[in-house]
């Protein structure tokens, strides 16, 4: 079954701050999901640990995003073009685990770009129910 070409950062309507990294990540091949999901859990744990020194960190958003990435990966596997969908899910998860992406993750609004990437990918794949509120 043919795989669709990946959408550009502009096609997804990503914030300018997220476009360069998204474009780099879209060139990656999907790797080992168990390892990447472990990195996602570790990233959430770093947020939880950092909460002791900064009560304003977006820990709740990190938890929601970490959980939602697992659901996105699972749904991608059942998509009409699973190779394409899983590749985009991979990009969303990789974007999340990179601390210095469009914005420094460990700042008050540091996950806004991560949420924007996740939500844009969900919308592009037609998984509107997986989208997270950007608080």
Regions found by a protein language model. Give the residues of each.
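Terminal, membrane-proximal amphipathic helices
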Residues: 1-90, 116-135
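Membrane-inserting effector segments that mediate pore formation, membrane fusion
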Residues: 82, 86-118
């Amino acid at each position: 079954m043919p795989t669709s070409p990946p959408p550009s950062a502009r096609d997804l309507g990503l914030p300018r701050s997220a476009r360069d990294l998204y474009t780099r990540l879209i060139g990656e091949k999907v790797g080992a999901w168990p390892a990447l999901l472990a990195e996602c859990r570790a990233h959430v744990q770093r947020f939880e640990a950092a909460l002791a020194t900064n009560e304003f960190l977006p820990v709740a958003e990190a938890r929601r995003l970490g959980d939602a990435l697992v659901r996105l990966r699972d749904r991608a596997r059942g998509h009409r073009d699973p190779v394409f969908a899983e590749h985009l899910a991979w990009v969303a998860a990789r974007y999340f685990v990179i601390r210095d992406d469009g914005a420094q993750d460990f700042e008050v609004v540091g996950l806004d770009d991560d949420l924007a990437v996740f939500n844009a990918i969900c919308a592009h794949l037609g998984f509107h129910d997986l989208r997270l509120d950007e608080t």
